[in-house]
Structure formats: C-alpha cells, structure tokens
Amino acid sequence: MTYTDTVRKTFAITTPLYYVNDLPHIGSAYTTMAADAVARFERLRGKAVLMITGTDEHGQKIQRTAESNGLQPQEHCDKIAAGFDALWQKLNIQYDRFSRTTSPRHEAIVKEFFGRVWDKGDIYLGQQKGWYCVSCEEFKEERELLEGHRCSIHPNKEAEWRDEQNYFFALSKYQSQLEALFQERPDFIQPESRRNEVLSFVAQGLQDFSISRVNVDWGFPMPVDPNQTIYVWFDALLGYVTALLDPDSEPSLEKALEKWWPINLHLIGKDILRFHAVYWPAMLMSAGLPVSGHVFGHGFLTKDGQKMGKSLGNTLDPVELVNRYGADAIRYYFLKEIEFGKDGDFSETRFVDIVNADLANDLGNLLNRTLKMVQKYCNALVPNVNGEDIPADHPLKAIGLELSDRTSVAYEALAFSEACREIFTLVRACNKFIDEQAPWSLYKQGNSAAVEQVLYAVLESVRLSAYLLSPIIPNISTDIYQQLGFSLNFNEKTLINNSVTYDTHATWGTLPAQQQLGEPRPVFVRLEQA
C-alpha cells in the first residue's frame, strides 16, 4: 500500500474527529501521532500539506454526559475540545485545522450536503425498530449483541430498545457502486485485514441507515423536519469537508472542495472502519463528489498484554505519560514498537528499555562522543572532507546512499516501524565503524586524513538519520541538527520547505565541510524504570 499521489502537489490527511464524551485516551493520541508523522514527512518532501483533526460534538451521549456533570452541552464540548487541543500541543502535533462539528460554518456545510442528497432522492422517512447503543450512537443487529442485549464494544452498557420514525439514507442503493470501488481500487481500504472485514460486511447486503433522531435536542435540526435532529455520523463525517474551508471564506461546498479535495488519507481506529469505508463513500457518491483516496484502520492498544479499561484500573493517561517522559519518547515508542495496522501493547518496562537503548545509547551517545572527538581532533569544525570523494562501497556511505529511498517506501506504506529499523541500521553501523576504525589510535599515529574521513562519515550518517527521523522525533532531530551547526528547527513548518531542501538533506554526503559545530550535549537523557 502507498498513499502517494505523484500528480497532486497538495496532501490532505485526517485523524477522526474525536467524540467528546470524555477526555482523550491513548488510542486517540496514537492515531494523531501517526497522522502528524505522515504530515511532517510530506512537508519535508515539499508538498503543501493540510492536516485535519478535531472533535465530533453532537448526539444523545454528549447531551446525557453534559447533564450528568451539571453542564450545558456546549460547555461540555468546549471543555473536552480544549483537552484534546492541549494534549496535541504537548505531543508536538502540528495540525493545520481543528474541526468542531458544533460550529455555525459546519452547520452550513451539513445543510448544503443534505440538500444534495435529498434532491437525489436518497433520503426518506421510515420506521426504525431495534436495539440502540447510546455509546456507539447506532442501532445494533442481534448478531452484534452479547447476552443481555449488551453491545460488544460497550459490554458494561445495555442497549436500549427503540421504535421510532427516522429519516434514512439509501445505502443499499450504492451496493454495486461500492463493490466496484473496492475492486477498482484495492488499496482504498488498508491494511488488507481491514479490507477483508469491509468486503465481508458488504457481501452480507447493505442496509439503509438512519440519519436522524427524535427527542434529541443536541444536534442540527433536519432541514426538512425540525422535530428531528441529524444523526451524528451524517453530521460528523462532513466535519472533514468543513475543515477544508479557508478561515475567511464563505461556508459552501464549492469553496471547501476547490483546493484540497479529495482528501488523500483518512487515518482511523478499526472500530470506526465501517463508517469511513462504507457509509462515507456512499454519501459522497450520492452528493456527486469524488471519494477520498485511502482509509487506513489501525489496531487497538493493550497494556501489559491486557485490554485497557477503567474497571480494570489499567488505563493509560496520555497527558501523564507525556508529562513524565516527554513527547519524542512517546512518539518514538508507539510508532517504532507497534506495527501500524496491527494491535499493539504498551509495557512501561519495555518502553523505558527501548527508548534508552535507541535514543540515549545508540543515537545520543554516538553523536556525543563523535562531536567530542571532532572538538579534540578537528577544532570543532566538520572535517575538511567532500562526501563525493568517499568511495561508494564505504560501509556507511553504502547504507546511506540507499537509506532515503528505503525510508520513503516505509513512510508511504505507513510502516513507521520499518522506517525506524532502516534508519537505526545506519546508526548501529556507525557505532560499529567507530569502534573498528578507532580514530583515537589513528590520531596518535599521525594519520589525520584517515581521522577526518572516519569522523566525517559518522557525522554525515548521524545527520541523515536525524533528518529522516524528524517526522517521528522532531525535537531530538532539531537538537542534533543544531549541534551539527545548522540553524534549523524541524517544528517550524512554515519554513521547513524553504530551509531544508529534501533532495539535498535526504542525500548522504551533503554535510558542508568546515561547518562550525555546536557544543556537545545529550539529546536524550536516559529514563529510569518506575
């Protein structure tokens, strides 16, 4: 799988619009860290990038949660949305748009989109009977429920029996078009396991789904029936479209879609796959709009091999984690250690071991000891060596020359683990190379030319590694670059394309000779086991 579109110069990526029933959990952080890494990588490559995140703020569950806390629904939404934004700042998430589905601009988009689908004849009034999970905000079929009519996703909450008139979207009308989409674009849904889930679901025959609710005040009124409110998914999915609007533009579909549509990549958890891979493309087809590029559903997270839950007392608070360990350590562990797309586990012991071994020992110590040798042997200047003069079969150059291509393939496949493995192959080769070449011995022998070539090759390999790791650990990469004499911050996204040309910086051998180096300092302080 690759999300790359070589024709378009723009790149739009979304996280889900997170439901504001509660403060963000580690799963929300995981999705958003991955999306941020992709967005940063595409900015490095010179694309105009739009990263969208935000909050889904309507529905009965929100209304009930707000009431139970003695708040008005909007007060509750404002509080939780601020919590998401605060966590994104702590995790160094560089989103471009934060979409909130309670905004007046969003209501205008929803009404216009509804009008298109209504005019197409794809919305009708019907009777809905069945078991309704308030937490999922959807009706459940009998086969989806556990004993006692409990939702399999929310087993602690019993579903409610509902018998009401609602408006429906004619999803079944798009059965053949969706099947054609999945056949013509086999990489539309990824990974393969998620695609197979969707194909199996669609093969059972699609059922029309309700897009309105009665007796729910917290939502946009139905344009054709003010006694009903628009159901959360027909409202929430359009938050991606609203986010495409420039801040000062009129809220219309034409304005929203003129630059960034179709969105290249929706990153989601597998629990909301059906809505993004089936409902959403059918809605877009009905409105006469192009379908998004790709939908990627990642796996669930466990802790110490167990499913997380408040009842088990083993939830992971992402705010507490980042306050204790720092953003880069958290980003690195979750993106490197968990194969994106599969379920993954967090173990605090393993977390500390991994980041200490990779970031403190292999990468941090390598930079530190090399800079100290350059201080001692080369007056704190990059050795006077031209990277082009180093033979192609040099043990570090041979890896470095292929590293950008190999890492790009991994990033494009959302294989963050593989990208890290490729990069650390070079880092570990550097440590081995220094030990074998022993520049301190070469210096004592008076072989200054050999010393300079050894140290240049290592410094350049560290630079390239930091550059290619910057989408994942931007703070550490910035620190490394600045110690190597560059006045560069990988967090300055508006400047990154101008100051860091990808073709130059992703190529081994471009570290300028005689560049003044900074004072060596640790880029990552070892963590202690709790």
Outline where the language-model segments fall.
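Basic, alpha-helical terminal appendages of large translation-related enzymes
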Residues: M1-T10, L50, G54, G126-W131, ...
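Cys/His-rich short segments
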Residues: K120-Q175, E179
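A charged helix-plus-loop insertion that forms the helical arch/lid used to bind
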Residues: T65-D78
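Short, charge-patterned binding micro-sites
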Residues: T55-K61
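Structured secondary-structure scaffolds
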Residues: T2-T53, R105-I109, P155, E160-K376, ...
